């Protein structure tokens, strides 16, 4: 026995005979039932938004304002704080009410989405063509598909511009680089120079270059969102008003499963990029909320021990370590003064607590001897003991302690989860792309289900 994909647009129910898929194939049964598929998607959106709201309120219920967010395992409240809500100088929480509002708004909107999902899954038209030709579609209708793509792009562009509006007109964003240890700041002069914005795309992804992940100021972040927002909206209008060119019609597979594979591929790429951002970037993921990056914790340890030993009388400019290199300070191959020891590998780290101590040629020895501020000392000590490393002993030069088994950095959670999910999405992309291409070539008949245990089981109903 072979499970076939149904080519009929007139499928009227969701059993195996009419759809080609059994109940356990989930939404595959709804490929040609646009109304029911809409219900599944709206309900799914409701679940996502419900999780966001409920989890925000859960984090808030357990939140201790006196402790850093990253010490409490929080991943949602830090995102709200990064947008400038509820926090003040140094990332200190000054008002928890915005966190409550965000959670409740998500809960309420999830109820609306949930109702819409249930309605379209149970009561709404099976196919949207019954309701309106505007909302109806055929997977093979190339013009309709690119029109739908256009609407999606416009919504994405509006989303990007909402961040711009928050940054420029509605209170600003939290800027970890603000003088004195970070503060909420309105972005009045976003970077619009295309050479700067698109220059990030041309950078090497390695070392100190860091591709787009290397962005280290909010002017460039907001300017980039202005560019991408306008490009998405312009692209959306373009796709609504035009029909696909001949080369596009020939190059792409035009089927529901092909669109699924394209979407999974895009999500996979974004997941991998998000992994790099949350692991390495301390501008859009401020360390005050997410904890230090790995290189940051290592550099913070070098700074902490330098401060300690300098107070005890060590000459940090000339002391040698066990290898003959500088124990506290040394020169990089290109001549800059950098921290010595194992943290030399992270010589190109940049952080707001360290940059005031730099001069024209790396770390400034005079500033290190005479101008380290108490807030820099405190922050280095704090970051040293909160490295995003799951280990009980020294890793990469960071001396962790036995209690660190109770600390897992949000950067570790977010980077690992996004990497794993991005990988699964990549596999899904390849799987569905292969099936879509095979179906288009005319030799995809599905998987032989003869020995499938579920086929010998009684019906659920």
Curated annotation (Swiss-Prot):
Cytoplasmic topology ranges: 1-48, 134-155, 254-268, 450-461
UniProt membrane topology term: Multi-pass membrane protein
Residue intervals passing through the bilayer: 49-71, 112-133, 156-178, 233-253, 269-289, 425-449
Topological domains, Lumenal: 72-111, 179-232, 290-424
Cofactor binding mode and count: Binds multiple chlorophylls and provides some of the ligands for the Ca-4Mn-5O cluster of the oxygen-evolving complex. It may also provide a ligand for a Cl- that is required for oxygen evolution. PSII binds additional chlorophylls, carotenoids and specific lipids.
Compartments where located: Cellular thylakoid membrane
Keyword presence, Membrane: yes
Highest taxon of the lineage: Bacteria
Subunit structure: PSII is composed of 1 copy each of membrane proteins PsbA, PsbB, PsbC, PsbD, PsbE, PsbF, PsbH, PsbI, PsbJ, PsbK, PsbL, PsbM, PsbT, PsbX, PsbY, PsbZ, Psb30/Ycf12, peripheral proteins PsbO, CyanoQ (PsbQ), PsbU, PsbV and a large number of cofactors. It forms dimeric complexes. Part of a photosystem II (PSII) assembly intermediate complex PSII-I; crystallized from a strain deleted of psbJ, it forms monomeric PSII before addition of the oxygen evolving complex.
Purpose of the protein: One of the components of the core complex of photosystem II (PSII). It binds chlorophyll and helps catalyze the primary light-induced photochemical processes of PSII. PSII is a light-driven water:plastoquinone oxidoreductase, using light energy to abstract electrons from H(2)O, generating O(2) and a proton gradient subsequently used for ATP formation.
Protein name: Photosystem II CP43 reaction center protein
């Amino acid at each position: 026995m072979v499970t076939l994909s149904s080519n009929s647009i007139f499928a009227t129910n969701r059993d195996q005979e009419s759809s080609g898929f059994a109940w356990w194939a989930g939404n595959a049964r709804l490929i040609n039932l646009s109304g029911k598929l809409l219900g599944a998607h709206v309900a799914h959106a409701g679940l996502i938004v419900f999780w966001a709201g409920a989890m925000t309120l859960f984090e808030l219920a357990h939140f201790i304002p006196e402790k850093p967010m990253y010490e409490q395992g929080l991943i949602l409240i830090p995102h709200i704080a990064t947008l400038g809500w509820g926090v003040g100088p140094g990332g200190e929480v000054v008002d928890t009410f915005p966190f409550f509002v965000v959670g409740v708004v998500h809960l309420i909107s999830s109820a609306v989405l949930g109702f819409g999902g249930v309605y379209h899954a149970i009561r709404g038209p099976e196919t949207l063509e019954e309701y309106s030709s505007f909302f109806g579609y055929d997977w093979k209708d190339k013009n309709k598909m690119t029109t739908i793509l256009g609407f999606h792009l416009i919504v994405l562009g509006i989303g990007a511009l909402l961040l711009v509006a928050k940054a420029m007109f509605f209170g600003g964003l939290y800027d970890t680089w603000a003088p004195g240890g970070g503060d909420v700041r309105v972005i009045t002069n976003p970077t619009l120079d295309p050479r700067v914005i698109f220059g990030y795309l041309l950078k090497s992804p390695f070392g100190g270059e860091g591709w787009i992940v290397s962005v280290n100021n909010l002017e460039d972040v907001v300017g980039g969102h202005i560019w991408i927002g306008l490009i998405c909206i312009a692209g959306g209008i373009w796709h609504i008003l035009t029909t696909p060119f001949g080369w596009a019609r020939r190059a792409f597979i035009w089927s529901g499963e092909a669109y699924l594979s394209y979407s999974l591929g895009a999500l996979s790429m974004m997941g991998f990029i998000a992994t790099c951002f949350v692991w390495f970037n301390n501008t859009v993921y401020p360390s005050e909320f997410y904890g230090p990056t790995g290189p940051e914790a290592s550099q913070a340890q070098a700074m902490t021990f330098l401060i300690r030993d300098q107070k005890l009388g060590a000459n940090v400019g000339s002391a040698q370590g066990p290898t003959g290199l500088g124990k506290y300070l040394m020169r990089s191959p290109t001549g800059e003064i950098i921290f010595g020891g194992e943290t030399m590998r992270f010589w190109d780290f940049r952080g707001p607590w360290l940059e005031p101590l730099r001069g024209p040629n790396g770390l400034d020895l005079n500033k290190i001897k005479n101008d380290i501020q108490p807030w820099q000392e405190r922050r280095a000590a704090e970051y040293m003991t909160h490295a995003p490393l799951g280990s009980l002993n020294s890793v990469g030069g960071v001396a962790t302690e036995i209690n660190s088994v109770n600390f897992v950095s949000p950067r570790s959670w977010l980077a690992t989860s996004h990497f794993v999910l991005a990988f699964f999405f990549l596999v899904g992309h390849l799987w569905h792309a292969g099936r879509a291409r095979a179906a288009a070539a005319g030799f995809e008949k599905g998987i032989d289900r003869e020995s499938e245990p579920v086929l010998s089981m009684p019906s659920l109903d």
